[in-house]
From Swiss-Prot:
GO MF annotation: an example: structural constituent of ribosome
Organism: Thermococcus gammatolerans (strain DSM 15229 / JCM 11827 / EJ3)
Name of the protein described by the UniProt record: Small ribosomal subunit protein eS17
Entries under Pfam families matching the protein: Ribosomal_S17e
Domain of life: Archaea
Gene: rps17e
Length: 67
């Protein structure tokens, strides 16, 4: 069974994804760099979790599971 992501990670990821939809791709490494540029997150762990969730959102949007 997986872990549930914390609310502030989901909220931050959704805000970034809604605000800058063209800056994110299915590539985690690219998304990680974009999160670093667009936010002031200092923790590497939090940055990676946000980037991972954004990667998941991009994949779900491409598959038509979210609008």
């Amino acid at each position: 069974m997986g872990n549930i992501k914390q609310a502030f990670i989901k909220r931050t990821a959704r805000e970034l994804f809604d605000r800058y939809p063209d800056k994110f791709t299915r590539d985690f490494e690219h998304n990680k760099r974009m999160v670093q540029e667009l936010t002031n997150v200092t923790s590497k762990t939090i940055r990676n979790r946000i980037a991972g969730y954004i990667t998941r959102l991009v994949r779900m949007k491409e598959e038509g599971k979210i609008l």
